[in-house]
């Protein structure tokens, strides 16, 4: 799958590409995994949100987690990535 990071999708197209039902999409959205962007009064979803949801679904499937467990894992992975970036900056100084 090729993603363009300035690409935005409407909700129906987002669900189709992520292969999720509308109900499942709303759960991910409520959990903060999928965050919309409002442009010109329209709600859209950026491509990076699609990549994040695909990653979330893989984690959920691989580790047999529920939605909140998956959301927690994603948050922790993001925190680890930030800490690694900070560590790399300190190591380069």
What are these regions (language model features)?
Residues 2-12, 16, 30-35, 39-93:
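Arg/Lys-rich, alpha-helical DNA-contact motif
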């Amino acid at each position: 799958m090729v993603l363009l990071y300035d690409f935005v999708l409407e909700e129906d197209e987002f669900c189709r590409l992520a292969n999720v039902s509308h109900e499942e999409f709303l759960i991910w959205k409520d959990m903060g995994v999928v965050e919309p962007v409002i442009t010109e009064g329209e709600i859209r979803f950026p491509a990076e949100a699609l990549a994040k949801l695909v990653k979330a679904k893989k984690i959920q499937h691989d580790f047999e987690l529920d939605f909140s467990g998956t959301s927690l894992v994603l948050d922790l992975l993001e925190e680890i990535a930030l800490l690694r970036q900070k560590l790399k900056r300190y190591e380069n100084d």
